[in-house]
Each structure stands twice: as C-alpha cells, then as structure tokens.
Regions:
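Active-site glycine-centered loops adjacent to acidic/histidine catalytic or metal-binding residues
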Residues: 15, 57-58, 87, 120, ...
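A short, structured active-site edge motif that brings together acidic residues
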Residues: 82-93
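His/acidic metal-ligating clusters that form di-metal
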Residues: 38-52, 129-211, 245-248, 257, ...
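Binuclear metal-dependent phosphoesterase catalytic core
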Residues: 30, 182, 201-264
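N-terminal active-site segment of His-dependent metallophosphoesterases
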Residues: 1-70, 146, 163
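Active-site-proximal beta-strand elements of phosphoester/diester hydrolases
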Residues: 7-21, 114-124, 153-155, 208-214, ...
C-alpha cells in the first residue's frame, strides 16, 4: 500500500432535518436551521480546510427542492468539498439532483490521497429502516476492486449493526450483516460511518471500525428501549485518515446547542 500521501481530514455531519421553513420541526425541538448554522460556524472555526465534508442523510424533514436548496446555502459557508447521502426522511431523487446541480457529490466515490471514500445509498422508499440494494452492494465491491492500493472508508445513513437502543435497532440497515460480510473480504476497508442514530457510536466488526455520529439537531438517548431524547449538544465527527491506513477520530460537541426545552 503506497504511503507517499499526506493525511486526510474528513468531517461528518448528519441528520440536519431541515423543515419546510426555518424553525422547530416539532414541539420541544430547537430550530433546525439555527442548530445547523451553529454547528457549521463551529466547524469552520475549528477546521479551516478539511478535505471533505460528508453529510450522511436525513438532510430534510420536508423533502422538497427549496428545502435542499436552503441546506446547500447553509453548507456554502464551508471551504471544503461536500458529498451527501439520502436518509429515510429524504427524497433521494430530489436531494441527489439538488446536490449535483450545485457541484457537490451524492452517493458515488471519491479518491483522496490513497484513500477511497464510498457513499452507499441505504434509502428504502416507504420504510424508516434502510436497505443496501443488490445494485449498491455490487457497486461498492466493484469500486473497491478498482482501487486495490487504496484504503477504504464507507459512509451510509443507516447503522450497519445494532447500537443498543431497541427502537433504533428495529430500523437500522436491514441487510447490514450482508454488507459487512462483503466488506470483510477486502482487507483495505478500514471503517464504516453512519448517521440515523443521533448519537455517538464506536465499535468494531473484525478489523472494520464502525462509527455513528451525533445529529446537528437533537440527540437520542443511548441505550433506550423506546424513543427518548438526550439533552446533549449537537455535534459532528472528525476523522483523520493516514497514508498507512490508520484512522483517528473524535466527536466535537458544539457549545450553545443544548436544546433548552429538554433541560428545563
């Protein structure tokens, strides 16, 4: 594996849930736009030139073209390439067209140094859970096979393993085991990152690091049997990818984003 490249910084944000108009999407929630703006301001201040910002799904609560355009306006403050995925709340076709028309990536692959970043579409029309279609699974394998000298990071919206919250584990990636079985066949796959769970997660499947990310909006209570909110700050994940295949990561919580209604 070549090691002549510099290290790569990738930032993950997820589950922005922008509504039809700025403001809370439901009672007790903070303003989705204000939360996102605070996260992006912090991100831009803390990281002046990331190599890529990945937005891993549930981009919109109301999946309409003007909402995705408003999200893109928010993201325009970032001095970095952007790639996104659809989640269960999104309209994949509208979201994809909006991002591509704006010059950003959606699904697909991107080479950064000697790393290959792959976005997998797990959106499944009519379902809260996710599905990696046979076409997507084959695309992922083909992409990895075309880059035998690159380390691999896979991004998907739905969690590929149970995360310890019963209600969330029922709506994860329905064929996550199949995806992981395929990824395990390729020694250069180092990590799989995901959104959907509105909380940090850090686990392993064999040699593959599995990482979940806080939402820019509200957080879900870890280890909860039923839906429950956690009064924690919004956040994002920082990933540092090294030429030798090492990965370092941390979650950044953004001061001032703790939902007031959940802490009173």
């Amino acid at each position: 594996m070549a090691t002549k490249h510099n290290d790569i910084t990738v930032i993950q944000i997820t589950d922005t849930h922008l509504g039809r108009t700025p403001g809370p999407i439901r009672s007790g929630y903070p303003d989705s736009d204000a939360q996102l703006a605070a996260v992006l301001e912090d991100l831009a201040r803390q990281h002046d030139a990331p190599d890529l910002v990945l937005v891993t799904g549930d981009l919109a609560e109301d999946p309409e073209k003007p909402v995705y355009e408003r999200l893109l306006e928010h993201l325009s403050v970032l001095p970095a390439p952007i790639a996104a995925l659809a989640g269960n709340h999104d309209d994949h076709a509208i979201a994809r067209r909006s991002f591509i028309d704006a010059g950003h990536g959606f699904d697909g692959e991107r080479v950064l140094g000697n790393w290959l970043i792959i976005g997998l579409d797990s959106s499944w029309a009519g379902h809260a859970g996710g599905l990696a279609s046979a076409t997507e699974l084959q695309r992922i394998e083909d992409a990895i096979s075309r880059h035998p000298e690159h380390w691999v990071l896979v991004a998907v919206h739905h969690p590929v393993v149970p995360v310890g919250s019963l209600w969330l584990d029922r709506i994860g990636l329905s064929n996550g085991g199949e995806l992981l079985d395929r990824l395990e066949q390729h020694r250069q796959v180092r990590a799989c990152i995901f959104g959907h769970i509105h909380q940090a997660f850090d686990g392993m499947h064999g040699s593959i690091r599995l990482l979940g990310c806080p939402s820019t909006l509200v957080q879900f209570q870890p280890g909860s049997l039923l839906f429950a909110l956690d009064p924690a700050e919004a956040g994002y994940r920082i990933l540092r990818l090294y030429p030798d295949g090492r990965l370092e990561t941390a979650v950044r919580r953004v001061p001032g984003t703790r939902p007031t209604a959940l802490t009173e």
